Amino acid sequence: MPEFKLADRLATLPPYLFAEIDRLKAEVAAQGVDIISLGIGDPDLPTPDFIIEALHKAAKNPVNHQYPSYVGLLTFRQAVADWYKERFDVELDATKEVVSLIGSKEGIAHFPLAFVNPGDLVLVASPNYPVYPVASGFAGGEVEIVPLLEENDFLPNLDAISDEKWDKCKIFFVNYPNNPTSATATPEFYAELVAKAKKHNVIIAADAAYTEVYYDEDKKPISILETPGAKDVAIEFHSLSKTYNMTGWRCGMAVGNASLVAGLGKIKENVDSGIFQAVQEAGIVALKEGEPYVKEFRKIYKERRDCVIEALEKINISCKVPDASIFVWAKTPEGYTSSEFVSKLLKETGVVVTPGNGFGESGEGYFRISLTVDTDRLKEAVSRISKL
């Protein structure tokens, strides 16, 4: 039988973080251990019934079983534009500044292909969602990490980047509310970033998937597009996944600079055929009618966050109280690397958390807890951690 060698771009990839966690989890579960998984950020709360009913109704329309538009239904894109206006007071032209995505991950993965040439520099604020550097590498880009440090509230020090690097940079990936640190961006930071990007002709790719999971009405996460001049240089990726508990539906959007949106759309029309239209129609209903349900989800996540923070404090594990996202970013106990602690925790207690170094070297010394199980299970998980 012939053997086929993987392309170099695959051979150099590290194991995908969450796939590796699933593998280890399966090994321990096979031994009969009760697993509490706080690893992957996949909401356990159900999609609201009214969204499911909208999908059911739309799926009965024969028109929705034909090929969809590559860029998405105009009605869906208009619903996105209306939602951005209501939520962030950002004006978007639905015909030019919005494109639908098969989940934001798909759009992020394809975006560098539209703008990165071999050898171009891509800056990634890290710890980071692994897709940013992988997608940039697939496009031939040279990736450099910009560390996010706790003493700077996990915001990049833009002045520490030399003018030479700014001039070489094609794309700068940022993510707020941040996965995994849960940090949020300030208007001052975004203003500084936009000014740097405009000065050096850099594209800002902002991942904003967690803006709707927040815990204080006075601390709502912001969109980079609220920043004056941001639309000149920025594209923002968003998703219905975390907001409405629709991770499996694969429905997202990219918005912002028209030429950046068009470039991404050009890639998409050559590699995919858009989102099932019934899902888009359900997405319209979610965007228009979902806020009362999202408010209830926030209350649940806040209760879970507070439960975890209180329990970690009792066992002297340090963490910053997050204002947003579905994660708690905690310091690894003294004497362990991130991977050592996570592996020991899983093997000896059955609790799955994510090692900080899985999000890049800047994540070493931390681990991430996902608030995706009920409060009783969270308490049980922290109780097991305390006995380690």
UniProtKB/Swiss-Prot annotation:
A GO term, aspect molecular function: pyridoxal phosphate binding
Pathway where this protein functions: Amino-acid biosynthesis; L-lysine biosynthesis via DAP pathway; LL-2,6-diaminopimelate from (S)-tetrahydrodipicolinate (aminotransferase route): step 1/1
Keyword hit for Transferase: yes
Reactions catalysed according to its record: (2S,6S)-2,6-diaminopimelate + 2-oxoglutarate = (S)-2,3,4,5-tetrahydrodipicolinate + L-glutamate + H2O + H(+)
One Pfam match: Aminotran_1_2
Binding residue positions for pyridoxal 5'-phosphate: 70, 104-105, 129, 179, 210, 239-241, 250
PTM sites of type N6-(pyridoxal phosphate)lysine: 242
Record has Secreted as a keyword: no
GO terms under biological process: lysine biosynthetic process via diaminopimelate
SUPFAM superfamilies: PLP-dependent transferases
Keywords from the named record: Aminotransferase, Pyridoxal phosphate, Transferase
Enzyme superclass (EC): transferase
Cofactor dependency: pyridoxal 5'-phosphate
Subunit structure: Homodimer.
Entry function: Involved in the synthesis of meso-diaminopimelate (m-DAP or DL-DAP), required for both lysine and peptidoglycan biosynthesis. Catalyzes the direct conversion of tetrahydrodipicolinate to LL-diaminopimelate.
Name the record gives this protein: LL-diaminopimelate aminotransferase
